[in-house]
């Protein structure tokens, strides 16, 4: 009976990858114009062994003045999660919503800290509704499957 008890535990949260580029420094630092900011987020999950998953949230933050990059930060925050005895129809939501919600605050802090340490005002990543993001991805996948089947 104990084997059937659902298990959801965080084993570890860690910074998997981080890069910062300032390709146009120092000249770009003399510009007075406000840069544009583009932020891209992604979530990926990989099974490690039976019942253990790595879930990673990736952020790419690029700031530009005109067509020149001020800085580019790419960060991947990951977590190892033990997920066992959970119904198959709930696994997607746990991996696509619950796990990223746990990891994301660490990613936000690492991005803000990296940008600040590089000498720029911090970039604060907004709160993310991972449930809405997951539902959009599921709807897009269902739509793609429907259009492929026709």
From Swiss-Prot:
Superkingdom field: Bacteria
Reported function: One of the proteins required for the normal export of preproteins out of the cell cytoplasm. It is a molecular chaperone that binds to a subset of precursor proteins, maintaining them in a translocation-competent state. It also specifically binds to its receptor SecA.
Subcellular location as annotated: Cytoplasm
Keyword annotations: Chaperone, Cytoplasm, Protein transport, Translocation, Transport
Cellular component terms (Gene Ontology): cytoplasm
Similarity annotation: Belongs to the SecB family.
Predominant localisation class: cytoplasm
HAMAP family recorded: SecB
GO biological process: protein folding; protein tetramerization; protein transport
UniProt GO molecular function: unfolded protein binding
InterPro entries: SecB, SecB-like_sf
Pfam family, one: SecB
Protein name: Protein-export protein SecB
Subunit structure: Homotetramer, a dimer of dimers. One homotetramer interacts with 1 SecA dimer.
């Amino acid at each position: 009976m104990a084997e059937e008890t659902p298990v959801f535990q965080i084993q570890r949260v860690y910074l998997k990858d981080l890069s910062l580029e300032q390709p146009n420094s120092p000249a770009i630092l003399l510009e007075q114009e406000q840069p544009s900011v583009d932020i891209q987020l992604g979530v990926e999950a990989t099974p490690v062994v039976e019942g253990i998953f790595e879930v990673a949230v990736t952020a790419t933050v690029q700031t530009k003045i005109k067509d020149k990059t001020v800085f580019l930060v790419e960060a991947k925050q990951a977590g190892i999660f033990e997920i066992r005895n959970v119904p198959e129809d709930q696994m997607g939501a746990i991996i696509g919503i619950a796990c990223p919600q746990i990891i994301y605050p660490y990613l936000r802090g690492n991005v803000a800290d990296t940008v600040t340490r590089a000498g720029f005002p911090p970039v604060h990543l907004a709160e993310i509704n991972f449930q809405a993001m997951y539902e959009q991805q599921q709807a897009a996948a269902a739509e793609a499957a429907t259009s492929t089947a026709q």
